[in-house]
């Protein structure tokens, strides 16, 4: 039996490799393995908890320099005294807000995920972009199409 979904996943994984977007390629390959093995019974759990677990892991990665001491408290304190750091803080707040909107929109309109994934891969492949922020991208989409 011909599995169109598997073919689409393989195509997206290939685009990930072609565009040097290892994160997307590996993620899709993991999902392919889950799909073609008995692990597929975990898809409901992955769909329900995957985004939250991913955000937790991402937050751990972002906070690690503070926890390890690589980013000393003095640097954090000085970030409130420099105008460039204040701009960075403001942008961080805006991006976090957009990411929150993105999570909401991805949950209510999951059909957007494929378009965002293709757009991310094309941006990396054609414009030497960096594959960051599908949640932020979805947040921007929510500003255009409305948060539903």
Curated annotation (Swiss-Prot):
Mode of membrane association: Multi-pass membrane protein
The keyword Cell wall biogenesis/degradation is annotated on this UniProt entry: no
Chief place of localization: membrane
GO cellular component, one term: plasma membrane
Keywords on record: Cell membrane, Membrane, Transmembrane, Transmembrane helix
InterPro entries on file: UPF0756_TM
Spans traversing the lipid bilayer: 14-34, 51-71, 86-106, 112-132
Location of this chain's protein in the cell: Cell membrane
Domain of life assignment: Bacteria
Family: Belongs to the UPF0756 family.
Protein name: UPF0756 membrane protein YeaL
């Amino acid at each position: 039996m011909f599995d169109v979904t598997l073919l689409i996943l393989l195509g997206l994984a290939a685009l990930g490799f072609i565009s040097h977007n290892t994160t997307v390629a590996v993620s899709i390959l993991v999902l392919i393995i889950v799909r073609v093995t008995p692990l597929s019974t975990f898809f409901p759990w992955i769909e329900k908890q995957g985004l939250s677990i991913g955000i937790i892991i991402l937050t751990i990665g972002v906070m690690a320099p503070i926890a390890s001491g690589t980013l000393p408290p003095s640097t954090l304190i000085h970030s409130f005294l420099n105008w460039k750091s204040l701009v960075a803080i403001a942008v961080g707040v805006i991006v976090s807000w957009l990411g929150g909107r993105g999570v909401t929109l991805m949950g209510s309109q999951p059909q957007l995920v494929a378009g965002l994934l293709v757009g991310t891969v094309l941006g990396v492949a054609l414009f030497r972009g960096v594959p960051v922020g599908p949640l932020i991208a979805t947040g921007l989409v929510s500003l255009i199409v409305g948060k539903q």
